[in-house]
């Protein structure tokens, strides 16, 4: 059981904070993790999209149209990159304000979770002890059978398998009993935790705190929208000439094709 708990802990540690331990860096914030994931995702899309554009431009039709799609694609990538740089601090400020405004709720829930954890810990320790006892019981039963297999070689393999079946069923039934007992012991605490959460939400709904939080969230969103407008306008101005050039090229090609067809 300790190995299972340790494995899960290592999994989460490796997935979130381990690299900061080895690098001696400060742990990433929630916004930093989201930003890193989004950056990797967008970069992957840009790289794969550029490959498709390059393939089309190399085709006969692409060479005939001469749209310079790869150059335009790189221009779009550069413009979007500038947009990300401009919006990064604004968005980070939004998340920071949001986290500050919800600190009180997280603190209340953490207190309840810590209290429940202390109450259920004896049941978890008891379950771990029972688990270890059953594993030792299982090893004692299986050990002699393994020795017989080594001595009797292959002809006794089928007999060994038949003798292992009831042992496996026995350990399964015994562990199922312990799991059911643990579930029964923890059930009241799960219900209590749900009740406390419902009480917190009801209290939040009836208090002025929720109205204040809604106002703050609305203000944060409004601020984010206002600060993002210049960056979005820069993006629009950067893309407009490229789109107009693209449209003019396509229309010219259509007119030329129509003239050729009409003269035939």
Curated annotation (Swiss-Prot):
State its role. Answer: Participates in the reverse transport of cholesterol from tissues to the liver for excretion by promoting cholesterol efflux from tissues and by acting as a cofactor for the lecithin cholesterol acyltransferase (LCAT). As part of the SPAP complex, activates spermatozoa motility.
Tell me the name of the encoding gene: Apoa1
Q: A single GO BP annotation from the record?
A: lipoprotein metabolic process
Q: What is the protein name given in its UniProt record?
A: Apolipoprotein A-I
Which residue stretches belong to region 10 X approximate tandem repeats?
Answer: 67-264
Could you tell me which species this protein originates from? Peromyscus maniculatus bairdii (Prairie deer mouse)
Q: Which residues form a coiled coil?
A: none
What is known about its processing and modification?
Glycosylated. Palmitoylated.
The taxonomy runs: Eukaryota, Metazoa, Chordata, Craniata, Vertebrata
Record's GO cellular component terms:
chylomicron; extracellular vesicle; high-density lipoprotein particle; low-density lipoprotein particle; very-low-density lipoprotein particle
Give the signal peptide range: 1-18
Q: Keyword set for this entry?
A: Cholesterol metabolism, Glycoprotein, HDL, Lipid metabolism, Lipid transport, Lipoprotein, Oxidation, Palmitate, Phosphoprotein, Repeat, Secreted, Signal, Steroid metabolism, Sterol metabolism, Transport
Q: Which InterPro entries match?
A: ApoA_E (IPR000074), Apolipoprotein_A1/A4/E (IPR050163)
Q: Where in the cell is it found?
A: Secreted
Q: Which residues carry this modification: Methionine sulfoxide?
A: 109, 193, 242
């Amino acid at each position: 059981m300790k190995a299972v708990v340790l494995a899960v802990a290592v999994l989460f540690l490796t997935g979130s904070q381990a690299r900061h331990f080895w690098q001696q860096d400060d742990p990433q914030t929630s916004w930093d993790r989201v930003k890193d994931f989004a950056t990797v995702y967008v970069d992957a899309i840009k790289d794969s999209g550029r490959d498709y554009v390059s393939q089309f431009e190399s085709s006969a039709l692409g060479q005939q149209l001469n749209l310079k799609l790869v150059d335009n694609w790189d221009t779009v990538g550069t413009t979007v990159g500038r947009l990300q740089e401009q919006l990064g601090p604004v968005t980070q400020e939004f998340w920071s304000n949001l986290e500050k405004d919800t600190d009180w709720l997280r603190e209340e829930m953490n207190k309840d979770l810590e209290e429940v954890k202390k109450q259920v810990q004896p049941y978890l320790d008891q379950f771990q002890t029972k688990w270890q006892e059953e594993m030792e019981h299982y090893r004692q039963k299986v050990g002699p059978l393994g020795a017989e297999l080594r001595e009797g070689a292959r002809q006794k393999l089928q007999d060994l398998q038949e003798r292992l079946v009831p042992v496996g069923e026995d350990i399964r039934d015994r562990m199922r009993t312990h799991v059911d007992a643990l579930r029964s012991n923890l059930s009241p605490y799960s219900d209590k935790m749900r009740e406390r959460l419902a009480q917190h939400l009801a209290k939040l709904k009836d208090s002025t705190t929720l109205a204040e939080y809604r106002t703050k969230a609305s203000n944060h969103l409004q601020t984010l929208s206002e600060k993002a407008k210049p960056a979005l306008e820069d993006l629009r101005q950067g893309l407009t000439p490229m789109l107009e050039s693209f449209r003019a090229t396509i229309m010219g090609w259509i007119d030329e094709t129509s003239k050729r067809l009409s003269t035939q």
